[in-house]
Regions:
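N-terminal Rossmann-like or analogous alpha/beta NTP/dinucleotide-binding catalytic cores
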Residues: 2-135
C-alpha cells in the first residue's frame, strides 16, 4: 500500500495530496540548464531537489518519467559563439556533457528524457502564436 504523498502547491500556497493523473504513474518536467558555461550551485540545488522527488516517487512504487530540458539556443550561447568562434553544437555538447558529469558526481538519477530546445522550435513557435492569437 502506498503512503499518501503531500506536496506544496505553489499556486494555491498550501500542501495538497499528490493525485497522479494516471494510477501508479508520475510525470515530472524540470526546466534544465542553459548550456553555455559550466554548472553552478543553482544547477546542483535544482537537480538535488528534483532528484529527491524522483526517489520518493520511486520508493512509493510510482513509474516515474522524469524529463529535464536543455536550453541549447539563447542570447548567452550566441554571445559565446561570437566570443570563441566555436559552433553552437560544439559549445552546447561540451556543456551538456559537463553538466551530465557533474550530475553523475552528485549521484543524481538519470532522466527519462532530455529534450533540447533546438529540436522543438517549431512547436514552441506554434504555442507562442496560439497565445498571441488569444490576446
Amino acid at each position: 500500500m502506498k503512503k499518501q504523498l503531500t506536496l506544496f502547491d505553489s499556486v494555491k500556497k498550501q500542501k495538497l495530496p499528490f493525485e497522479p493523473q494516471e494510477q501508479n504513474k508520475a510525470s515530472v518536467y524540470v526546466c534544465g540548464p542553459t548550456v553555455y558555461d559550466d554548472s553552478h550551485l543553482g544547477h546542483a540545488r535544482s537537480a538535488i531537489a528534483f532528484d529527491l522527488l524522483h526517489r520518493v516517487l520511486k520508493a512509493n512504487n510510482y513509474n516515474v518519467t522524469m524529463t529535464k530540458n536543455f536550453t541549447d539556443i539563447d542570447d548567452k550561447i550566441i554571445k559565446k559563439i561570437n566570443e570563441t568562434g566555436q559552433t553552437l553544437e560544439e559549445i552546447t555538447t561540451k556543456y551538456i556533457n559537463a553538466y551530465k558529469n557533474d550530475m553523475e558526481t552528485l549521484n543524481i538519477l538519470e532522466n527519462s528524457q532530455e529534450p533540447k530546445a533546438t529540436k522543438n522550435l517549431t512547436s514552441m513557435i506554434e504555442m507562442i502564436n496560439d497565445l498571441i492569437s488569444k490576446d
